[in-house]
């Protein structure tokens, strides 16, 4: 077993002392209440004059240093007021998280005000502008305050409470919490890599081994897919790979949660289409290749086929090379295909004209008997053809009906003049949707591809006007996501299906990822069920993927601190739809800041190196996005054909970025461009 890598702080501060034991606070008394009120009144006056933006700047009537000292004293007093409000104690935060909880509350108190002018004033004096206070908020503020006292010629000093992290201790706490949740960091990087498993990982040991050897630190299993047998096989392959590679890897299992989706759609016609291949000028470059197989015992084609047509075995067995099959297709067009190959009980046919083949279509077989002549041999019919999956075409201004009834959806119906008879309709997976939405609220479908406004709501039906769709319309399919960011749905984040799989998760996983968390009650509900199952030590990652979850993040963190191994995932897919794409960058920054203040590790997820994982080639923008993952403690990759390559490249990107960046801090290592200048 390879020795664990030294922590970032160990490498940087090996000689530093460990966390001190608690001692009596040495906080110097703050200004009298009257003085604090004076500063507060001045701040409120400035806030009113600036349209609600509070500025902590020196005024012309006061010496700048005195004003800055007063502003910092006010911020410090507000931190203590919020700490004393009982918020931390009522959430029963674990002892190991008490200092982090206080630091989080201090950070929230700091960020309740607009301190941009104060930052500018401090920077003009060559002091810290409080822009990197997250790990140790009160200590940062107190240090700046003491420097200001000295600059003002005062002998007064202020000390931070011993109940909050001092300089260096915040980073230590975050690193310790990350190690507890995700395991020790690999030797060359401190950011872990989480990888979503495809079903293939249950049967392909080499895939799991290669992922582990290339840098996977955490295996992610999505409980919305497959089942316990498949999940067990994935974990067995991982444990075997750990022994072979001498590496350790955590297992995280995602609970599916109450995902709001569209229902089924009535199937389309049982018809299939094939066509020959043509060049840019429309000339045929190769005929369509059709695989003819038995309708009762079909076999998969050994080569790519343009169409697969089932035929009854007796008729199929009598087909020979060069036989020609004549038929009238679904459009009434006369068509034919010729037998070009025999593969066991199956046949290969070729055709040079496009055709639409339907179930029960008559095939007349003719065989060459002499030059230019063919004799009738037999008639047979096309066997069962699977109906086409149907979608709903939605254009700007169209109406869509969302129904409580789970009857299959259907497209809109129009008369010969294209006048609407009945609008398109489709069911919704969760009945709570109809009790929680209101007219006038926005709705997004299919990961934000289609936007609309809810116009009317009845107990069994919601009428939506489509307000966003590309020219030519969008296709809405079955099982597509629905987001209602401004609605308040009464949903439990733990579904009945989640509770069924939770015992397996407790027994086999290291971490449970909790989907669609919205409130403190959701967190407490999961913790309660884990305790009943003997899973109190199981790591918990809350997935922030709704606007409500984001708005409640501080309280979610305090509730989460009842558990020891904890983390947050930025699920950027749903979150972008819920909060708006234009706000995603801002929202993910806020999550990173707040979690750093709470010393809680963050998983950076959704569409990281997506093009690389699926197509083998990354886009320029997603490489930059992956590099941003350096600011989190873990980066998650989704499954794809080239996931092993994606893991290797992501690991390389993170290793290269580590000397340049640590959270919000730019690290000034020796710069190549400066050396070659």
List each language-model region with its residue ranges.
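Residue-level detector of intrinsically disordered, flexible termini
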Residues: 1-7, 44, 279
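Intrinsically disordered, low-complexity arginine-rich tails of RNA-binding/processing proteins
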Residues: 6-14, 668
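Ala/Thr-enriched low-complexity intrinsically disordered regions
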Residues: 2-8, 21, 35
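N-terminal intrinsically disordered, low-complexity tails
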Residues: 12-23
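Non-catalytic helical/linker scaffolds that mediate oligomerization, partner binding
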Residues: 36-677
């Amino acid at each position: 077993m390879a020795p664990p890598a030294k922590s970032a702080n160990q490498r940087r501060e090996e000689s530093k002392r460990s966390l001190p034991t608690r001692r009596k606070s040495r906080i110097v008394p703050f200004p009298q209440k009257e003085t604090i009120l004076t500063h507060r009144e001045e701040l409120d006056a400035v806030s009113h004059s600036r349209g609600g933006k509070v500025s902590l700047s020196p005024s012309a009537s006061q010496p700048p240093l005195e004003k800055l000292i007063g502003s910092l004293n006010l911020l410090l007093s507000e931190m203590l007021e919020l700490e004393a409000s009982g918020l931390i104690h009522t959430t029963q935060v674990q002892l190991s998280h008490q200092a982090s909880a206080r630091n989080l509350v201090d950070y929230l108190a700091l960020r309740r005000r607009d301190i941009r002018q104060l930052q500018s004033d401090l920077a003009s004096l060559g002091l810290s502008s409080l822009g990197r206070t997250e790990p140790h908020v009160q200590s940062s503020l107190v240090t700046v305050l003491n420097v200001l006292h000295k600059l003002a010629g005062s002998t007064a000093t202020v000390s931070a409470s011993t109940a909050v992290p001092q300089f260096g201790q915040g980073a230590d706490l975050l690193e310790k919490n990350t190690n507890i949740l995700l395991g020790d960091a690999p030797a060359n990087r401190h950011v872990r890599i989480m990888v979503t498993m495809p079903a293939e990982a249950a049967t392909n040991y080499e895939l799991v081994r290669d992922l582990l050897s290339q840098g996977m630190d955490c295996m992610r299993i999505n409980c919305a897919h497959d089942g316990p047998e498949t999940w067990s096989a994935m974990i067995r392959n991982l444990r075997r790979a750990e022994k072979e590679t001498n590496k350790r890897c955590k297992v995280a299992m995602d609970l599916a949660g109450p995902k709001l989706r569209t229902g089924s759609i009535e199937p389309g016609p049982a018809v299939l289409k094939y066509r020959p291949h043509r060049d840019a000028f429309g000339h045929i470059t190769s005929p369509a290749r059709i695989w003819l197989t038995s309708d009762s015992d079909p076999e998969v084609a050994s080569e790519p086929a343009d169409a697969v047509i089932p035929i009854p075995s007796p008729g199929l067995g009598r087909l020979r090379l060069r036989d020609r099959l004549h038929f009238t297709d679904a459009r009434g067009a006369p068509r034919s295909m010729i037998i070009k190959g025999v593969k066991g009980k199956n046949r290969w046919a070729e055709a040079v004209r496009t055709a639409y083949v339907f179930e029960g279509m008559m095939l007349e077989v003719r065989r060459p008997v002499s030059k230019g002549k063919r004799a009738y041999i037999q008639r047979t019919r096309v066997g069962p053809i699977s109906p086409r999956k149907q979608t709903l075409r939605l254009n700007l201004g169209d109406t869509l009906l969302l129904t409580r009834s789970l009857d299959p959806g259907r497209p809109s119906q129009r008369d010969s003049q294209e006048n609407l008879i009945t609008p398109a309709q489709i069911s919704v997976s969760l009945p709570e949707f109809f009790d929680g939405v209101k007219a006038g609220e926005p709705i997004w479908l299919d990961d934000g591809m289609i936007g609309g406004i809810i116009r009317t709501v009845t107990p069994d039906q919601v009428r939506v006007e489509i307000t966003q769709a590309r020219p030519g319309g969008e296709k809405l399919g079955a099982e597509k996501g629905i987001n209602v960011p401004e609605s308040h749905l009464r949903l439990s984040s733990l579904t009945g299906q989640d509770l069924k799989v939770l015992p397996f998760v407790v027994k086999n996983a290291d971490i449970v990822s909790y989907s669609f968390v919205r409130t403190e009650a959701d967190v407490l509900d999961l913790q309660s069920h884990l305790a009943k199952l003997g899973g109190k030590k199981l790591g918990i990652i809350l997935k922030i993927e709704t606007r409500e979850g984001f708005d409640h993040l501080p309280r979610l963190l305090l509730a989460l601190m009842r558990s020891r191994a904890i983390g947050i995932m930025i699920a950027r897919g749903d979150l972008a739809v819920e909060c708006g794409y234009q706000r995603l960058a801002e929202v993910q920054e806020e999550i990173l800041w707040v979690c750093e203040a709470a010393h809680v590790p963050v998983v950076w997820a959704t569409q990281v190196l997506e093009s690389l994982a699926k197509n083998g080639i990354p886009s320029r923008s997603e490489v930059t996005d992956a590099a941003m993952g350096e600011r989190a403690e873990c980066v998650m990759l989704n499954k794809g054909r080239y996931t092993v390559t994606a893991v290797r490249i992501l690991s390389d990107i993170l290793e290269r970025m580590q000397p340049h960046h640590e959270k919000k801090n730019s690290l000034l290592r020796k710069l190549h461009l400066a050396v070659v200048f």
